Structure formats: C-alpha cells, structure tokens
Amino acid sequence: MEVNIEALEKLLDNKFNGNQTAFAEATGLERTHVNKVFKNKGKGAGALFCGAIIKYCEKNNLDYREYIFLQ
C-alpha cells in the first residue's frame, strides 16, 4: 500500500484547515507519525497509517481508494 499524498494534503486542508493535530486525533494516529508522513511526502506511511485512513474513510463515507493506492 502507498498513500496518495496529494489527496491526503487536500483532505488535511479541506477538513482540518491544515491542522495535523486535528487530523491525527480524527484518525487515531500519533501526531508525530502524521507529521512525519506529510513532511516526507508519504514515506513512512505503513500498515498502521493506511489502516487508520481506511477506518476514517469508512466512518465518514469517503472512498479510501482516493487516499491509498493498493498495489
């Protein structure tokens, strides 16, 4: 799995006003993990990060395939 960092950045800006802490709280991830993934343009996003994105999308009626590339 690989994240679509452009789509995640849009989600961060549109739903969380660019606030990574709010994004982390909404997804159940550590703020430092979220910051690392965004800072490194998607690198460091493993199964934990992707799983949290999938759960967030299911809870909020979003298509997780917009945010995660399944390979």
PLM regions and their residue ranges:
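Short C-terminal boundary/hinge segments that cap the last helix of small helical domains
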Residues: 58-71
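A short, Lys/Arg-rich alpha-helix, primarily the initiator
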Residues: 1-22, 26
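Recognition helix of helix-turn-helix/homeodomain-like DNA-binding domains
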Residues: 28-45
